[in-house]
């Protein structure tokens, strides 16, 4: 039985806000260049009770937005990113993670693998 590729996640939690440009760049390369994860990408930057969420249903390795965020992404205490390898259906924004829900006046963001 061979190894099956799955989606990949990157998360960072820090006491102080930091930039994740280098880590985002490394993950983005796996999103269609060094890896098969070409079916979408997303990143969430948290700031207190708010979240800044970006997603695209296209390869992260080819995204001008990813390149921009690698240099200009906001420093954050908490970052969650995901690159998608579709196992069902075509790439679509509604299937691109992280997902966001607002409950009780607070943004909740999640991503999963499988």
Placement of each model-derived feature along the sequence:
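Fold-independent oxyanion-binding glycine-rich loops
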Residues: 12-15, 82-85, 113
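Short acidic (Asp/Glu) patches
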Residues: 57-69, 83-106
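Short, well-ordered loop/turn elements at secondary-structure boundaries
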Residues: 4-6, 37-39, 74-75, 93, ...
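A short, Trp-centered hydrophobic/proline-enriched beta-strand micro-motif
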Residues: 42, 79-82
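Short, surface-exposed secondary-structure junctions/capping segments
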Residues: 68-78
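Conserved beta-strand-loop-short alpha-helix elements that form
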Residues: 7, 108-114
């Amino acid at each position: 039985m061979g190894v099956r590729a799955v989606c990949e996640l990157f998360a960072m939690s820090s006491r102080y806000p930091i930039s994740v440009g280098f880590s985002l760049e490394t993950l983005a390369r796996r999103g269609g260049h060094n890896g098969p994860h070409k079916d979408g990408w997303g990143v969430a930057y948290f700031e207190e009770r708010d979240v800044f969420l970006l997603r695209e249903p296209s390869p992260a390795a080819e995204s001008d937005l990813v390149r921009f965020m690698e240099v200009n992404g906001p420093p954050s205490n908490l970052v969650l990113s995901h690159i998608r390898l579709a196992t069902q259906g075509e790439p679509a924004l509604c299937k691109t993670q992280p997902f966001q829900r607002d409950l009780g006046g607070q943004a909740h963001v999640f991503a999963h693998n499988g």
